[in-house]
Amino acid sequence: MNKTKLLKVLFYLNIAVVVGLIGYKVYLNLVTSEFEAEHTEQLSDISARLEGQDSYSFAVVGNINNSVGIFERRIIPMLNDTDIDFLVSAGNAVSSGGEDKYRAIKGTLSRLDMPYLLTFGNNEYEEFGSFRFYDHYGPHFFSFTADDSRFIFLDSTGKTPWQWQLRWLTDILKADDSKHRFVFIGHPP
């Protein structure tokens, strides 16, 4: 008889956990605000911010996921107290590709007083994260120019074949006369 009661309790606990997880997923998708193509907005902000300037500066951070608390409490206030024009994350801004992780990093980065761009890294790729990254931020590899510099973001996760990216990169660089080129990649291929 005790075994039956224990199994009933475990069954109802499992049901409660499943209902809780489903409720959380529904909350994430219906209640929290949607965001998409964030890089488009960030690139517009970078262009507007740099317009008419003779020079600019940017900061590069990596693996925000390892210390989100420190990043929020110490790094963001320090960055906001500088004249830095924009921030680049060199990959692994999220701890996994889950929807909740993307929403959390959006909340964290919204505390910055400057535009930001993310490099598509291994953690962004995990748990179907590549689809979320594409929906929330944009393509896994892209480039933009600022003054006499070209900024190039590549996908080293294997999601986008290297041959495709190298062809794209070759075409861009053939027509590019930028004085400086900055390449961001989550990790060496």
Residue ranges and their predicted role:
Residues 34-35, 39-42, 52, 99-181:
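Extended active-site neighborhood of metal-dependent phosphoesterases/phosphodiesterases
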Residues 64-67, 93-96, 122-126, 157-160, ...:
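Solvent-exposed loop/turn segments at secondary-structure junctions
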Residues 1-18:
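N-terminal Sec-pathway targeting helices
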Residues 22-104:
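N-terminal active-site segment of His-dependent metallophosphoesterases
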Residues 60-62, 86-92, 115-122, 154, ...:
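Active-site neighborhood of phospho(di)ester-bond hydrolases with catalytic His/Asp-centered motifs
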Residues 3, 12, 84, 129-131, ...:
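Short, well-ordered secondary-structure micro-motifs
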Residues 15-26, 176-178, 183-185:
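Glycine/proline-rich, flexible active-site/cofactor-binding loop segments
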